[in-house]
């Protein structure tokens, strides 16, 4: 892992964008809860954020981002109490909570379906959000023709940074975090 010291920004009396040379950040995710998915595999993501855009690569889009839906969202769901109090009841990468419980219990309601999908649905391999137009990062514009140049530029920058820092998802087989 590499980083740059943030002490100057943390101790600064200024607010907002303090150091103009810091104009992007790379973040990553592998897992939140180890047993959220069969085989204890993670949900590998890497992202680059600039002032205007957030670009995300989901390395395994066939996996469930919030963990496997156990049971398979049949009619035989865990009770409300289990959903609220047991992280492992279903979608274990989202901690047990009233919000998670409500979303799961109302997943078939027409007004709640979109929110359920945003919270628990599978994600595409590439996501791009225009933060000026969509600050809440709801509308993925990665495949829209007018964003292809931005997407390609951010993808190139992200992958170069990951290679330069020997990120295990882009160096070697890319499976380091998935191996026991």
Report each predicted region and the residues it spans.
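Long, internal low-complexity/basic segments
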Residues: 101-126, 131-180
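C-terminal cap/loop subdomain of S1 sulfatases and analogous C-terminal strand-loop tails that border
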Residues: 1-127
């Amino acid at each position: 892992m590499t980083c740059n010291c943030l002490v100057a920004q943390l101790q600064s009396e200024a607010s907002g964008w303090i150091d103009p040379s810091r104009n992007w950040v790379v973040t990553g995710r592998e897992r939140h809860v180890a047993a959220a998915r069969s085989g204890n595999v993670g949900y590998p993501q890497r992202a680059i954020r600039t002032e205007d855009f957030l670009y995300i690569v989901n390395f395994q889009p066939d996996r469930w981002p919030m963990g496997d839906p156990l049971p398979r969202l049949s009619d035989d769901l865990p009770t409300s109490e289990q959903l609220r109090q047991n992280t492992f009841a279903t979608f274990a990468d989202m901690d047990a909570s009233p919000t998670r419980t409500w979303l799961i219990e109302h997943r078939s309601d027409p007004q709640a379906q979109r929110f359920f999908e945003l919270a628990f649905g599978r994600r595409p391999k590439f996501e791009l959000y225009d933060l000026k137009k969509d600050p809440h990062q709801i509308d993925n514009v990665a495949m829209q023709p007018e964003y292809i140049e931005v997407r390609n530029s951010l993808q190139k920058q992200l992958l170069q940074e990951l290679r330069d820092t020997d990120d295990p998802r882009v160096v070697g087989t890319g499976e380091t975090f998935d191996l026991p």
